[in-house]
Curated annotation (Swiss-Prot):
Pfam families: ArfGap, UBA. PROSITE patterns: ARFGAP (PS50115), UBA (PS50030). One of its GO terms (biological process) is negative regulation of phosphatidylinositol biosynthetic process. SUPFAM superfamilies: ArfGap/RecO-like zinc finger, UBA-like. It is found in: Nucleus. This is Protein GTS1. A zinc finger (C4-type) spans 30-53. The modification Phosphoserine is found at S153, S184, S187, S240. PANTHER family: FI20236P1, PROTEIN GTS1. The gene is GTS1. Residues 148-161 have a biased composition (Basic and acidic residues). It comes from Saccharomyces cerevisiae (strain ATCC 204508 / S288c) (Baker's yeast).
Amino acid sequence: MRFRSSSHSLKHVDRELKELINSSENANKCGECGNFYPTWCSVNLGVFLCGRCASVHRKVFGSRDDDAFSNVKSLSMDRWTREDIDELVSLGGNKGNARFWNPKNVPFPFDGDDDKAIVEHYIRDKYILGKFRYDEIKPEDFGSRMDDFDGESDRFDERNRSRSRSRSHSFYKGGHNRSDYGGSRDSFQSSGSRYSRQLAELKDMGFGDTNKNLDALSSAHGNINRAIDYLEKSSSSRNSVSAAATTSTPPLPRRRATTSGPQPAIFDGTNVITPDFTSNSASFVQAKPAVFDGTLQQYYDPATGMIYVDQQQYAMAMQQQQQQQQQLAVAQAQAQAQAQAQAQVQAQAQAQAQAQAQAQQIQMQQLQMQQQQQAPLSFQQMSQGGNLPQGYFYTQ
Protein backbone atom coordinates (compact mmCIF):
# COMPACT_ATOMS: atom_id res chain seq x y z
CA MET A 1 0.00 0.00 0.00
CA ARG A 2 1.32 3.42 -0.91
CA PHE A 3 0.97 6.40 1.40
CA ARG A 4 1.11 10.10 0.57
CA SER A 5 3.55 10.91 3.35
CA SER A 6 6.45 12.49 1.51
CA SER A 7 7.92 15.68 2.91
CA HIS A 8 7.14 17.46 -0.34
CA SER A 9 3.40 16.76 -0.14
CA LEU A 10 3.30 17.56 3.58
CA LYS A 11 4.89 20.94 2.91
CA HIS A 12 2.21 21.76 0.34
CA VAL A 13 -0.58 20.61 2.65
CA ASP A 14 0.73 22.64 5.59
CA ARG A 15 1.21 25.71 3.42
CA GLU A 16 -2.31 25.43 2.03
CA LEU A 17 -3.67 24.93 5.55
CA LYS A 18 -1.91 28.10 6.69
CA GLU A 19 -3.25 30.04 3.69
CA LEU A 20 -6.73 28.67 4.35
CA ILE A 21 -6.66 29.87 7.97
CA ASN A 22 -5.73 33.41 6.91
CA SER A 23 -8.16 33.55 3.96
CA SER A 24 -11.11 35.94 3.89
CA GLU A 25 -13.55 33.10 4.60
CA ASN A 26 -11.85 32.32 7.94
CA ALA A 27 -9.88 35.50 8.84
CA ASN A 28 -7.73 33.56 11.35
CA LYS A 29 -10.68 33.42 13.77
CA CYS A 30 -12.68 30.80 15.62
CA GLY A 31 -15.85 30.14 13.64
CA GLU A 32 -17.95 29.80 16.81
CA CYS A 33 -16.92 32.61 19.20
CA GLY A 34 -14.81 34.83 16.90
CA ASN A 35 -11.58 34.72 18.93
CA PHE A 36 -8.36 35.17 16.98
CA TYR A 37 -5.72 32.50 16.31
CA PRO A 38 -7.68 29.21 16.26
CA THR A 39 -5.67 26.08 17.06
CA TRP A 40 -8.22 23.37 16.19
CA CYS A 41 -10.63 22.58 13.38
CA SER A 42 -13.75 20.46 12.87
CA VAL A 43 -13.10 18.98 9.44
CA ASN A 44 -16.55 17.55 8.70
CA LEU A 45 -18.33 20.72 9.91
CA GLY A 46 -15.86 23.01 8.11
CA VAL A 47 -15.17 25.38 11.01
CA PHE A 48 -11.96 26.48 12.76
CA LEU A 49 -12.06 26.40 16.57
CA CYS A 50 -10.25 27.87 19.54
CA GLY A 51 -9.24 25.63 22.44
CA ARG A 52 -12.39 26.34 24.44
CA CYS A 53 -14.81 25.69 21.58
CA ALA A 54 -12.88 22.57 20.52
CA SER A 55 -13.29 21.07 24.00
CA VAL A 56 -17.01 21.89 23.89
CA HIS A 57 -17.29 20.11 20.51
CA ARG A 58 -15.71 17.00 22.03
CA LYS A 59 -18.00 17.11 25.06
CA VAL A 60 -21.21 17.67 23.08
CA PHE A 61 -20.51 15.19 20.27
CA GLY A 62 -18.29 12.67 22.09
CA SER A 63 -21.03 10.98 24.11
CA ARG A 64 -23.48 10.57 21.21
CA ASP A 65 -24.14 7.33 19.36
CA ASP A 66 -26.22 8.78 16.51
CA ASP A 67 -25.16 10.33 13.20
CA ALA A 68 -24.13 13.67 14.73
CA PHE A 69 -20.35 13.97 15.17
CA SER A 70 -17.50 16.46 14.91
CA ASN A 71 -14.08 15.41 13.60
CA VAL A 72 -11.87 17.80 15.64
CA LYS A 73 -8.19 17.95 14.65
CA SER A 74 -5.28 20.02 15.91
CA LEU A 75 -3.72 22.42 13.43
CA SER A 76 -0.18 21.74 14.66
CA MET A 77 -0.15 18.32 16.38
CA ASP A 78 -2.32 16.23 14.05
CA ARG A 79 -1.32 15.22 10.55
CA TRP A 80 -3.35 16.77 7.75
CA THR A 81 -3.95 15.27 4.33
CA ARG A 82 -4.96 16.65 0.98
CA GLU A 83 -8.45 15.23 1.51
CA ASP A 84 -8.87 17.25 4.72
CA ILE A 85 -7.93 20.47 2.94
CA ASP A 86 -10.26 19.70 0.05
CA GLU A 87 -13.15 18.99 2.40
CA LEU A 88 -12.61 22.29 4.24
CA VAL A 89 -12.50 24.21 0.97
CA SER A 90 -15.64 22.50 -0.33
CA LEU A 91 -17.55 23.32 2.86
CA GLY A 92 -16.58 27.01 2.65
CA GLY A 93 -14.77 27.40 5.98
CA ASN A 94 -16.23 29.56 8.73
CA LYS A 95 -18.50 31.52 6.37
CA GLY A 96 -19.83 28.36 4.76
CA ASN A 97 -20.48 26.87 8.20
CA ALA A 98 -22.40 29.98 9.24
CA ARG A 99 -24.50 29.97 6.05
CA PHE A 100 -25.40 26.29 6.41
CA TRP A 101 -25.74 25.85 10.20
CA ASN A 102 -26.70 29.37 11.31
CA PRO A 103 -28.69 31.12 8.55
CA LYS A 104 -30.65 32.98 11.26
CA ASN A 105 -27.40 34.70 12.36
CA VAL A 106 -27.88 33.89 16.05
CA PRO A 107 -24.93 35.58 17.84
CA PHE A 108 -22.53 33.78 20.15
CA PRO A 109 -23.52 34.27 23.83
CA PHE A 110 -21.77 37.25 25.44
CA ASP A 111 -21.27 35.40 28.73
CA GLY A 112 -19.51 32.49 27.04
CA ASP A 113 -16.13 33.52 28.46
CA ASP A 114 -17.47 33.26 32.01
CA ASP A 115 -19.77 30.22 31.83
CA LYS A 116 -18.75 27.26 29.68
CA ALA A 117 -22.22 25.71 30.06
CA ILE A 118 -23.67 28.54 27.98
CA VAL A 119 -21.28 27.62 25.16
CA GLU A 120 -22.41 23.99 25.39
CA HIS A 121 -26.05 25.05 25.06
CA TYR A 122 -25.13 27.21 22.04
CA ILE A 123 -23.29 24.36 20.27
CA ARG A 124 -26.10 21.90 21.08
CA ASP A 125 -28.78 24.27 19.78
CA LYS A 126 -26.76 24.91 16.61
CA TYR A 127 -25.77 21.38 15.56
CA ILE A 128 -28.02 18.95 17.50
CA LEU A 129 -31.38 20.72 17.83
CA GLY A 130 -31.05 22.87 14.69
CA LYS A 131 -32.61 25.96 16.27
CA PHE A 132 -30.54 28.28 14.07
CA ARG A 133 -31.75 26.75 10.78
CA TYR A 134 -34.96 27.05 8.81
CA ASP A 135 -34.98 23.39 7.76
CA GLU A 136 -34.49 20.14 9.66
CA ILE A 137 -31.08 18.58 10.25
CA LYS A 138 -30.35 15.46 8.21
CA PRO A 139 -27.79 12.74 9.01
CA GLU A 140 -25.91 13.43 5.78
CA ASP A 141 -25.30 17.03 6.92
CA PHE A 142 -22.53 15.70 9.18
CA GLY A 143 -20.81 13.73 6.43
CA SER A 144 -19.54 10.18 6.86
CA ARG A 145 -18.03 8.81 10.06
CA MET A 146 -15.42 7.09 7.91
CA ASP A 147 -13.68 10.49 7.85
CA ASP A 148 -13.63 10.72 11.67
CA PHE A 149 -10.11 9.58 12.54
CA ASP A 150 -8.66 9.20 15.99
CA GLY A 151 -6.50 12.28 16.64
CA GLU A 152 -3.91 10.62 18.86
CA SER A 153 -3.06 7.76 16.52
CA ASP A 154 -3.23 10.11 13.53
CA ARG A 155 -0.29 12.10 14.86
CA PHE A 156 2.13 9.22 14.43
CA ASP A 157 0.58 6.62 12.13
CA GLU A 158 -1.28 7.23 8.91
CA ARG A 159 -2.00 3.60 8.21
CA ASN A 160 -5.26 3.73 10.18
CA ARG A 161 -6.80 6.21 7.74
CA SER A 162 -9.64 5.14 5.49
CA ARG A 163 -9.09 5.84 1.83
CA SER A 164 -12.83 6.21 1.26
CA ARG A 165 -13.73 9.91 1.05
CA SER A 166 -16.93 11.75 0.37
CA ARG A 167 -17.92 12.63 -3.20
CA SER A 168 -17.29 16.28 -2.44
CA HIS A 169 -13.57 15.46 -2.58
CA SER A 170 -13.83 13.77 -5.97
CA PHE A 171 -15.77 16.73 -7.32
CA TYR A 172 -13.32 19.25 -5.88
CA LYS A 173 -10.42 17.44 -7.50
CA GLY A 174 -12.20 17.82 -10.82
CA GLY A 175 -12.33 14.09 -11.64
CA HIS A 176 -15.60 12.53 -12.70
CA ASN A 177 -15.31 8.84 -11.98
CA ARG A 178 -18.13 6.52 -12.95
CA SER A 179 -18.16 5.14 -9.39
CA ASP A 180 -19.24 8.56 -8.16
CA TYR A 181 -22.56 8.03 -9.88
CA GLY A 182 -23.18 4.55 -8.58
CA GLY A 183 -20.93 2.58 -10.94
CA SER A 184 -23.30 2.33 -13.91
CA ARG A 185 -25.08 4.45 -16.48
CA ASP A 186 -28.44 3.48 -15.01
CA SER A 187 -27.46 4.97 -11.67
CA PHE A 188 -26.29 8.12 -13.44
CA GLN A 189 -29.60 8.44 -15.28
CA SER A 190 -31.61 7.84 -12.11
CA SER A 191 -29.69 10.60 -10.33
CA GLY A 192 -30.32 12.92 -13.27
CA SER A 193 -34.05 12.26 -13.18
CA ARG A 194 -34.14 12.71 -9.41
CA TYR A 195 -32.39 16.09 -9.58
CA SER A 196 -33.94 17.28 -12.85
CA ARG A 197 -35.47 20.39 -11.28
CA GLN A 198 -32.21 21.37 -9.57
CA LEU A 199 -30.27 20.74 -12.79
CA ALA A 200 -32.58 23.08 -14.68
CA GLU A 201 -32.12 25.79 -12.05
CA LEU A 202 -28.32 25.44 -12.15
CA LYS A 203 -28.36 25.65 -15.93
CA ASP A 204 -30.45 28.82 -15.79
CA MET A 205 -27.92 30.29 -13.35
CA GLY A 206 -25.08 29.82 -15.83
CA PHE A 207 -23.61 26.43 -14.83
CA GLY A 208 -23.66 24.66 -18.18
CA ASP A 209 -21.70 21.46 -17.44
CA THR A 210 -24.39 18.89 -16.65
CA ASN A 211 -21.93 16.28 -15.35
CA LYS A 212 -20.38 18.69 -12.87
CA ASN A 213 -23.79 19.95 -11.81
CA LEU A 214 -25.03 16.41 -11.19
CA ASP A 215 -21.85 15.56 -9.29
CA ALA A 216 -22.31 18.63 -7.10
CA LEU A 217 -25.98 17.83 -6.44
CA SER A 218 -25.12 14.24 -5.55
CA SER A 219 -22.44 15.42 -3.12
CA ALA A 220 -24.86 17.94 -1.59
CA HIS A 221 -27.72 15.39 -1.44
CA GLY A 222 -29.96 17.66 -3.51
CA ASN A 223 -29.19 20.87 -1.60
CA ILE A 224 -28.83 23.43 -4.38
CA ASN A 225 -27.10 26.01 -2.16
CA ARG A 226 -24.33 23.59 -1.24
CA ALA A 227 -24.07 22.47 -4.84
CA ILE A 228 -23.46 26.07 -5.91
CA ASP A 229 -20.75 26.36 -3.26
CA TYR A 230 -19.10 23.19 -4.59
CA LEU A 231 -19.17 24.52 -8.15
CA GLU A 232 -17.74 27.91 -7.18
CA LYS A 233 -15.01 26.38 -4.99
CA SER A 234 -14.05 23.95 -7.73
CA SER A 235 -13.67 26.76 -10.27
CA SER A 236 -11.64 28.97 -7.92
CA SER A 237 -9.43 26.04 -6.87
CA ARG A 238 -8.55 25.11 -10.44
CA ASN A 239 -7.71 28.74 -11.21
CA SER A 240 -5.46 28.99 -8.15
CA VAL A 241 -3.72 25.71 -8.97
CA SER A 242 -3.05 26.78 -12.56
CA ALA A 243 -1.74 30.14 -11.39
CA ALA A 244 0.54 28.49 -8.85
CA ALA A 245 1.89 26.12 -11.52
CA THR A 246 2.96 29.02 -13.75
CA THR A 247 4.84 30.88 -11.00
CA SER A 248 8.16 29.59 -9.72
CA THR A 249 8.81 29.38 -5.99
CA PRO A 250 12.17 30.77 -4.78
CA PRO A 251 14.44 28.21 -3.11
CA LEU A 252 14.64 28.06 0.67
CA PRO A 253 17.89 29.10 2.41
CA ARG A 254 20.27 26.31 3.34
CA ARG A 255 20.33 25.05 6.90
CA ARG A 256 23.50 24.56 8.86
CA ALA A 257 24.53 20.94 9.17
CA THR A 258 23.63 19.38 12.53
CA THR A 259 24.49 16.00 13.97
CA SER A 260 21.38 15.54 16.09
CA GLY A 261 18.80 16.12 13.37
CA PRO A 262 16.47 19.06 12.84
CA GLN A 263 15.54 21.14 15.85
CA PRO A 264 12.41 23.27 16.42
CA ALA A 265 12.96 26.75 14.99
CA ILE A 266 11.83 28.82 17.99
CA PHE A 267 12.38 32.56 17.68
CA ASP A 268 14.15 33.91 20.80
CA GLY A 269 13.96 37.62 19.91
CA THR A 270 17.63 38.05 18.87
CA ASN A 271 19.10 38.81 15.47
CA VAL A 272 21.80 36.19 14.81
CA ILE A 273 23.71 36.14 11.51
CA THR A 274 25.34 32.82 10.68
CA PRO A 275 28.84 32.67 9.16
CA ASP A 276 27.48 30.95 6.06
CA PHE A 277 25.17 33.84 5.42
CA THR A 278 27.87 36.48 5.81
CA SER A 279 30.32 34.58 3.62
CA ASN A 280 27.84 33.99 0.81
CA SER A 281 26.39 37.52 0.84
CA ALA A 282 28.16 40.11 -1.25
CA SER A 283 26.90 43.01 0.82
CA PHE A 284 25.40 43.03 4.28
CA VAL A 285 22.53 45.34 5.17
CA GLN A 286 22.08 46.21 8.82
CA ALA A 287 18.88 44.65 10.15
CA LYS A 288 16.27 47.04 11.44
CA PRO A 289 14.27 46.36 14.61
CA ALA A 290 10.89 44.78 13.97
CA VAL A 291 7.86 46.96 14.57
CA PHE A 292 4.87 45.18 16.11
CA ASP A 293 1.70 46.06 14.17
CA GLY A 294 -0.77 44.20 16.39
CA THR A 295 -0.98 40.99 14.32
CA LEU A 296 0.43 37.70 15.57
CA GLN A 297 2.64 35.84 13.10
CA GLN A 298 2.83 32.06 12.88
CA TYR A 299 6.05 30.30 11.84
CA TYR A 300 6.19 26.95 10.12
CA ASP A 301 9.17 24.58 10.38
CA PRO A 302 9.26 22.44 7.19
CA ALA A 303 11.61 19.91 8.82
CA THR A 304 9.33 19.02 11.72
CA GLY A 305 5.97 20.11 10.29
CA MET A 306 5.19 22.16 13.42
CA ILE A 307 3.74 25.68 13.64
CA TYR A 308 5.26 28.08 16.17
CA VAL A 309 4.17 31.44 17.51
CA ASP A 310 6.51 34.25 18.55
CA GLN A 311 6.14 34.40 22.34
CA GLN A 312 7.17 38.06 22.47
CA GLN A 313 4.51 39.07 19.96
CA TYR A 314 1.98 36.89 21.77
CA ALA A 315 2.78 38.67 25.06
CA MET A 316 2.45 42.08 23.37
CA ALA A 317 -0.90 41.08 21.88
CA MET A 318 -2.16 39.92 25.27
CA GLN A 319 -0.90 43.15 26.85
CA GLN A 320 -2.76 45.23 24.27
CA GLN A 321 -5.91 43.22 24.88
CA GLN A 322 -5.62 43.76 28.65
CA GLN A 323 -5.09 47.49 28.14
CA GLN A 324 -8.19 47.68 25.97
CA GLN A 325 -10.19 45.84 28.62
CA GLN A 326 -8.90 48.20 31.31
CA GLN A 327 -9.78 51.24 29.22
CA LEU A 328 -13.25 49.83 28.65
CA ALA A 329 -13.68 49.23 32.39
CA VAL A 330 -12.56 52.80 33.18
CA ALA A 331 -14.97 54.22 30.60
CA GLN A 332 -17.83 52.16 32.04
CA ALA A 333 -16.97 53.34 35.57
CA GLN A 334 -16.91 56.97 34.44
CA ALA A 335 -20.24 56.59 32.67
CA GLN A 336 -21.74 55.01 35.79
CA ALA A 337 -20.40 57.84 37.98
CA GLN A 338 -21.86 60.45 35.63
CA ALA A 339 -25.21 58.68 35.70
CA GLN A 340 -25.18 58.64 39.51
CA ALA A 341 -24.28 62.34 39.63
CA GLN A 342 -27.13 63.21 37.28
CA ALA A 343 -29.51 61.14 39.38
CA GLN A 344 -28.44 63.04 42.51
CA VAL A 345 -28.93 66.40 40.80
CA GLN A 346 -32.41 65.37 39.67
CA ALA A 347 -33.27 64.18 43.18
CA GLN A 348 -32.13 67.50 44.68
CA ALA A 349 -34.17 69.45 42.13
CA GLN A 350 -37.26 67.40 42.92
CA ALA A 351 -36.75 67.98 46.67
CA GLN A 352 -36.43 71.73 46.16
CA ALA A 353 -39.58 71.80 44.03
CA GLN A 354 -41.51 69.90 46.69
CA ALA A 355 -40.27 72.30 49.40
CA GLN A 356 -41.34 75.34 47.37
CA ALA A 357 -44.78 73.83 46.78
CA GLN A 358 -45.21 73.16 50.50
CA ALA A 359 -44.15 76.74 51.35
CA GLN A 360 -46.65 78.18 48.89
CA GLN A 361 -49.39 75.99 50.34
CA ILE A 362 -48.60 77.20 53.87
CA GLN A 363 -48.68 80.84 52.73
CA MET A 364 -52.10 80.32 51.12
CA GLN A 365 -53.47 78.78 54.31
CA GLN A 366 -52.17 81.68 56.42
CA LEU A 367 -53.72 84.23 54.03
CA GLN A 368 -57.10 82.49 54.21
CA MET A 369 -57.00 82.48 58.01
CA GLN A 370 -56.22 86.21 58.09
CA GLN A 371 -59.14 86.95 55.77
CA GLN A 372 -61.51 84.94 57.97
CA GLN A 373 -60.38 86.81 61.09
CA GLN A 374 -60.77 90.26 59.51
CA ALA A 375 -64.36 89.72 58.24
CA PRO A 376 -66.27 89.73 61.70
CA LEU A 377 -64.21 92.68 62.93
CA SER A 378 -65.20 94.93 60.02
CA PHE A 379 -68.92 94.05 60.51
CA GLN A 380 -68.76 95.02 64.20
CA GLN A 381 -67.21 98.41 63.42
CA MET A 382 -69.93 99.23 60.92
CA SER A 383 -72.73 98.37 63.40
CA GLN A 384 -71.33 100.66 66.11
CA GLY A 385 -71.27 103.62 63.77
CA GLY A 386 -74.89 103.11 62.67
CA ASN A 387 -73.96 102.56 59.11
CA LEU A 388 -75.24 99.18 58.25
CA PRO A 389 -75.33 97.98 54.73
CA GLN A 390 -78.64 97.94 52.92
CA GLY A 391 -80.72 94.95 54.00
CA TYR A 392 -79.29 94.78 57.58
CA PHE A 393 -81.26 96.07 60.72
CA TYR A 394 -80.88 96.15 64.50
CA THR A 395 -82.64 93.63 66.72
CA GLN A 396 -83.10 93.77 70.51
